[in-house]
Amino acid sequence: MTTRIDTKFAELKAEGRPALVTYFMGGDPDLETALKVMKALPKAGADVIELGMPFSDPMADGPAIQAAGLRALNAGQTLAKTLYMAAEFRKEDDTTPIVMMGYYNPIYVYGVERFLTDAKASGVDGLIVVDLPSEMDAELCIPAMKAGINFIRLTTPTTDDKRLPKVLHNSSGFVYYVSMNGITGAAIADTAKVGEAVRHIKKSTDLPICVGFGVKTPEQAAAIATHADSVVVGTAIVNAIAGELDEKGKVKGDPVAAATRLVHALAESVRATRLEAAQ
C-alpha cells in the first residue's frame, strides 16, 4: 500500500529537502474560514497538512490550540464537518497529504468503522491519535491500516529503548518526534539533542522522522530541518489565525493571509537549509 504520504516523502527525499508539515484546527474560527486556510496552505509551501479535530478535553495541547478548538466547537464544528473539509479540499488538490490529528473520543463516538470509511472517502491519508497507545492497536490502528490509512505514532525524549519498538510497531507514514516534554507551543528543545534523538530513532525504522512541538519561527524551523526529514509547525499558525480575530473569536482581519505569510516564510527557510547544507 502506497499512500500520498509515502509518495510525498519519496519525492522530497529525491529532491534532497525536508518537508514542512503544517497544523491548524478544523473549523477555527469557523468552517468557511478554516477551509480557505486549508486550501491556501499548499500554495504557501506546506508539503503535508495536519487537520486538527476539535475536542473539549485536549490534554496534550497548549493554551493556543485549546482556544482554537474551543472556538471551533463554539462555531458548531463537528467531526463530520472536519471530514467535509478534507473532502472539499480533495476536489482541488489530489496530491497534498492530509493527516487528521486529535483524540480518540470523538472518533469512538462517531463510530470507528464509520469514521474510517468516511475518512478514506474524504481523502484522508493518515491519523495521529495522541491518547491511543500501541497497546490499544486493535481499537483503531490496525483497522486504519486495513482501510488504507497510515497510523502515525508519537515518540518523545522519554521513549526509551524498551518502549521504542512497541511505539514503532504498526506505525506507518512517518514518525512524529515530540521535541520536548510538555504541551504544544512550549519552548523548543536544544536542536543538537533533537539531532541525536532523530539519529537514534532512525536506527530502528526506515520511516521519515518529523519533529514538532515548540517550532514557532522560520529560524527555528530551519535549525530543526538540518536534523529531521520534516518540521511540524502548529501553534504558530494557530496564533497567526487568532491574531486576526476579535475578542469574541470572530474574523476582523484576514486569517488566511496571516497564516499563508507565516507558512511561506517557514517553507522558504526549511527548503533553503537543506540546499545550503548540500552545497
From Swiss-Prot:
GO cellular component: cytosol
GO MF term set: tryptophan synthase activity
Regions crossing the membrane: none
Residue runs in coiled coils: none
Reaction(s) the record says it catalyses: (1S,2R)-1-C-(indol-3-yl)glycerol 3-phosphate + L-serine = D-glyceraldehyde 3-phosphate + L-tryptophan + H2O
Superkingdom per UniProt: Bacteria
Record note on quaternary structure: Tetramer of two alpha and two beta chains.
Known function: The alpha subunit is responsible for the aldol cleavage of indoleglycerol phosphate to indole and glyceraldehyde 3-phosphate.
Protein name: Tryptophan synthase alpha chain
Organism: Brucella abortus (strain 2308)
Name of the gene this protein is made from: trpA
